[in-house]
């Protein structure tokens, strides 16, 4: 195999070649085996956790979502949260592995020059921001550190104004950050913040909010807990070229 699971388990799947001395006729046809020097050893089988039906559904759903968002590439992964088994994994755009067996044509090569890199498994090789799933990290860290209690209420008006550190007294220099729900979610506790995926709640939980003197986690504690959750390190998935990602810190920035 040249990629994916087949590349990872090439030594297991390949087996061992046999060796014979044979007699051939003038047309190259084998007439008889003169000597059997070594019998071939078949390779072992590898059983995957992938669910074929779920894999098909995931690919169809991802294609539909990419079309709706007018996005040129996307990833979908379905896992068993109890075991970590990967039940479906889709990376688009993609390519056909069999091309490497049959021979790469000029048109194949030109198609692979797509800037969205179809030869890359974006599910494991890209390093991208985690998005709203990171709210679970912030929520857990804030509760563990006592920044939040289960009863703490933070208000979401749909946006938060962050003062410019170089012009703290000039409101015109402040930077607004918006919640996905621009109407706001109002006052809510951490369960509500997670249930609504409220951006402003976690802006405040992570960075604090000067108007109410609320002290958030801060960059270093967020980074510490991100690493405790395993971010910034390879997962060890049995696929080649996995990216470990990056947990940014104040020093890194």
What annotation goes with each model-predicted range?
Residues 1-43:
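Small/polar-residue-rich segments within soluble enzyme cores
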Residues 24-37, 50, 81-133, 137-253:
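Beta-lactam-recognizing serine transpeptidase/beta-lactamase-like catalytic domain environment
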Residues 30-74:
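Conserved, well-ordered alpha-helix/loop/beta-strand core segments that scaffold catalytic motifs
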Residues 74-77, 87:
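Generic short beta-strand
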